[in-house]
Each structure stands twice: as structure tokens, then as C-alpha cells.
Regions:
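Transmembrane beta-barrel strands of outer-membrane/channel proteins
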Residues: 47, 51-57, 99-103, 172-176, ...
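Residue-level signature of outer-membrane beta-barrel architecture
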Residues: 53, 89-90, 101, 142-144, ...
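Outer membrane beta-barrel transmembrane domains
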Residues: 260-262, 277, 281-316, 337, ...
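Surface-exposed strand-loop-strand hairpins of Gram-negative outer-membrane beta-barrel proteins
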Residues: 57-80, 186-189, 446
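Surface-exposed coil loops of outer-membrane beta-barrel proteins
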Residues: 114-130, 150-256, 260, 398-405
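Outer-membrane beta-barrel "beta-signal"
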Residues: 136-149, 379, 449-461
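Hydrophobic, lipid-facing positions within transmembrane beta-strands of outer-membrane proteins
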Residues: 45, 79-85, 134-140, 170, ...
Length: 461
């Protein structure tokens, strides 16, 4: 039954994407378990589907000037669509393989340019809005028992096979995936399909996590998982060109490493998590100071490297940084979260977004008081900044792959407030109203403020 519903959903997605191109508790468990009961009685498979569409826009705002990478100061709107099929198959004890074909279409406002904290986490800086089919994930997972420990049942879910797993184990993942699948997994602010939409709220903005334009990479992750803590380490490919689909296969000189320690705890019988993240990226990314010096002598050739137009001329680029993520349940219906992030800000942003320092704080609420426990309310504030070298580069008529107003003589922290209300219409369908207020877009006090309004439709099967 469920496989039929998913096929129908995929068909509807293809139809919907065509339109995008033309525009430039018990009941839940019963429903989601139909496929497992009728098709997969042994629990060998996992099949899920998601569809997300975001309609977003902003009215005109004050701007003293604009550059080629500026957020448009006239009113605009944009529509994005993604659809993902999550396929998983159990292989042997503790092992499984997962494949996720995905379709993405539409675009972000101003093609996702002009904001360090871009307003729609479902969009990427891609030149064409036409729907495209691609392989998002394809990875192998092996769980290894490391000592006698309690066995825990893990329910079947997206990219997750129903299985009994030891509470103390090592998990090895190899293949294509998003590093955000494993790291910085804040319980209240991580998924732009169902939570906050802003880029700097879905992940730690100062973590320039290695990925292609759509957010995926190839590599390996190893996790030590214990009941009260976890340790993760990854090594993956980095792009050959900033924010591109092409990976650099010279892995001796171009690679990205991320490490994270996660501590789990209880406060007054309510769960919480604290995560410490560190990363290093090696690539052909040039330094801001080198580009600034060259531009003062009339050589602006490195701007094409920073803006993702061509590959770097030599290896040796190093970016490193740190992040802290915290989330704590206060009541069964209320939770708080926070993030802090910093990177050295000396070399070009190569994969995620042009943020060198970030701090965020927010809350999530299930409004039981109005007897709608399936709904969700979120409110958060995030402040983003860049290094002095990054600031000087942008003020010298430099451009990154996201930012560049032509100058930046009046620098200010980019400040974002986001609020959303998510309504559960039926067991598999949600609609969200979202508002973002953005001060100093792209760190520029001469532009803004910007009001962003969004409607999001989300399906999960």
C-alpha cells in the first residue's frame, strides 16, 4: 500500500516540478507501517519519501547601492521544490545500504545571493531553476558491537532500518552523504524542511562543511556511540572549485576533516545535548590577504576563484574552525537551543556560506495549550560576522560565491530573527508560515532591513 502511495507521490512531484520550470500518533504509526506489514514482514527494507515546496518573497527595501551578488532591493518572490526517495536494504547483521535519488527545482530569492544567512535552506546557488534529478546519497553502514551492553530497538525511518542495536557500538559509514547527516545535529534547529529555514540556523554557519553545491560529498564517517556520549570523525572530498559540483580528487592535498564530541545528559528528567565540533579543510582556496594585495597592484584574477568561476592556482589553502551546539528540553512541549561558531577567516569560503563567526539562540514549542500537539512553533535569533580580511576583501570590490555588493565600507553584523508556525494538517502533511527579519543583509549597513515571508508545504511518507 505504502509503495503505491509513494509512487503516486513521485508522479505528482514530477508534475509539480514541471510547473516550477514553467514559473522560472496511532493513526500515524498505522499509516506509516502499512508498507512494512504488507511488503516487508521481515524488516529488511526501508522506503520513505519527502516532498517540500517553499514559496518565499520579500518587498522592496532601502539600498544605497547594489552589486552583482546583492540581494535584489526590489520586491521579488521565488519558489523551490525538492523531492527525495529514501531507499534502504538490510544486508547482514548490523549492515545496510542506502540510496536517495532526489529532484530539486526552482530557485532562492536573487538565486540565493546577497545573504550570508540565506533565507531558504532548501535552495542552493545554482544557475538554472529547472528541475534536476541526481543521486543525493548512496552509502554503506556497518554497526559493530564493542562490548556487552544493553540492546536498543531502533525503529525504521528515513535512511534507517528497523534493528536491535547495542547501546555501545562503532558505526562506520562509507559513500556519498551530507556531513550534516552526522554532525551538528541540533534537535530543535537542523532541518529546513520542517524547522527553521535560514541557512545559519539549520547548521553552524561558521562550519564551512565540505560539500558540492547541493550539500553532499563522498567520504567516510566513523562514530563511537555510548549511552551517555558519542565521538565522530570524518574525512571527505572537497570541491575543486568554490561551491561547485566538481570534487577535487587530489586527496593528498585536498580533503576535509571534521571531529565532534557529543555529551548526552538529563536535567530534571528532560534530555539535553552538548556538542563540540572542530574542522580543518585543505584545498586550493586562496587567502583574502593575497587577493587584496594583488588587487592593489591591479591584478584581480583571484576574484574568479573566490566567486567559484575557476579553480585555485595552487594548493595549500587551510581553513579551520570550531563550533558548539546545545539543546535542552525544558518541558515535554518546550525546548531551547543555541550555537556558537568561529573559523579563522583567512582563506576563501569554499563550500557552505560566507560566515566566519556566528551565535544563535532559540526556542521550540508544541502548543498543547490550544490542543494542537502536532503543531510546532519556533522563534530564534542569529548574529553572523566575518573576519577583518574577509571584510577588507569585499570592500575592495571583491566577490565571493554568495556575497559582493561592490563595496563594504559600512560593515555591520548580519542579524536575523526567524519565527515560524507549523500546522499538521494530516498524519503526513504539514504547512508552515515563516517570517524572517534581516538587518544588514550581507553585512552591509547601507542596505536593508529586509522582511522575508514564506509558506512551506511538506510531505513525509
Amino acid at each position: 500500500m505504502k509503495i503505491v502511495q509513494i509512487l503516486i507521490a513521485v508522479t505528482l512531484t514530477l508534475s509539480f516540478c514541471g510547473k516550477v520550470n514553467a514559473q522560472g500518533d496511532d493513526a500515524d504509526n498505522h499509516y506509516k507501517g502499512l508498507f512494512a506489514n504488507r511488503f516487508d514482514s521481515l524488516g529488511q527494507w526501508s522506503v520513505h519519501y519527502q516532498f517540500t515546496s517553499v514559496l518565499q518573497g520579500h518587498p522592496a527595501f532601502n539600498s544605497k547601492y547594489s552589486g552583482k551578488n546583492s540581494l535584489r532591493d526590489t520586491a521579488e518572490k521565488a519558489l523551490s521544490v525538492t523531492a527525495t526517495l529514501f531507499l534502504g536494504r538490510k544486508l547482514w547483521k548490523g549492515a545496510a545500504v542506502f540510496v536517495n535519488p532526489e529532484i530539486a527545482g526552482g530557485k532562492g530569492m536573487s538565486y540565493a545571493l546577497g545573504l550570508a544567512g540565506a533565507a531558504n535552506g532548501e535552495t542552493f546557488r545554482i544557475g538554472s531553476p529547472e528541475p534536476a534529478l541526481y543521486l543525493a546519497r548512496a552509502f554503506f553502514e556497518q554497526n559493530i558491537t564493542i562490548r556487552k551492553s544493553k540492546t536498543l530497538y531502533r525503529k525504521e525511518d528515513q535512511n534507517q532500518i528497523a534493528d536491535n542495536l547495542p547501546s555501545s557500538r562503532i558505526t562506520i559509514t562509507i559513500g556519498k552523504f551530507s556531513l550534516a547527516d552526522f554532525f551538528d545535529d541540533n534537535s530543535y534547529s537542523h532541518d529546513p524542511r520542517s524547522e527553521f529555514m535560514n541557512w545559519s540556523l539549520m547548521d553552524n554557519g561558521a562550519w564551512d562543511y565540505p560539500a558540492n553545491t547541493r550539500g553532499y560529498t563522498w567520504g567516510a564517517v566513523i562514530e563511537l556511540i555510548e549511552p551517555s556520549y558519542c565521538f565522530r570523525l570524518s574525512s571527505v572530498l572537497v570541491p575543486k572549485i568554490a561551491n561547485s559540483q566538481i570534487f577535487d580528487l587530489n586527496i593528498a592535498k585536498a580533503n576535509g576533516e571534521t571531529a565532534e564530541f557529543e555529551k548526552k545528559f538529563m536535567i530534571n528528567d528532560h534530555p539535553g545535548n552538548l556538542r563540540f565540533l572542530a574542522f580543518t579543510n585543505f584545498s586550493s582556496a586562496p587567502s583574502y590577504n593575497t587577493a587584496i594585495s594583488n588587487m592593489r597592484h591591479g591584478d584581480s584574477s583571484l576574484v574568479a576563484v573566490f566567486s567559484g568561476q575557476k579553480a585555485g592556482v595552487q594548493y595549500g589553502g587551510l581553513k579551520y574552525g570550531f563550533g558548539i551546539s546545545f539543546n535542552q528540553e525544558l518541558k515535554s512541549y518546550l525546548g531551547v537551543f543555541s550555537r556558537l561558531g568561529w573559523n579563522d577567516g583567512n582563506t576563501a569560503t569554499w563550500a557552505f556560506t560566507e560566515i566566519d563567526r556566528t551565535a544563535s539562540l532559540g526556542i521550540r514549542v508544541r502548543p498543547n495549550i490550544i490542543k494542537r500537539p502536532g503543531d510546532n512553533l519556533g522563534l530564534a535569533v542569529v548574529v553572523n560576522g566575518i573576519s577583518n580580511a574577509h571584510r577588507t576583501y569585499l570592500n575592495s570590490n571583491g566577490y565571493g560565491f554568495l556575497l559582493g555588493d561592490g563595496k563594504l565600507s559600512n560593515y555591520g553584523y548580519e542579524q536575523i530573527i526567524e519565527a515560524f508556525y507549523k500546522i499538521k494538517l494530516i498524519s503526513w502533511l504539514w504547512i508552515t508560515a515563516d517570517y524572517q527579519f534581516i538587518i544588514n543583509p550581507g553585512y552591509n549597513k547601507d542596505r536593508g532591513s529586509v522582511n522575508v515571508f514564506s509558506i512551506r508545504l511538506h510531505v513525509e511518507l
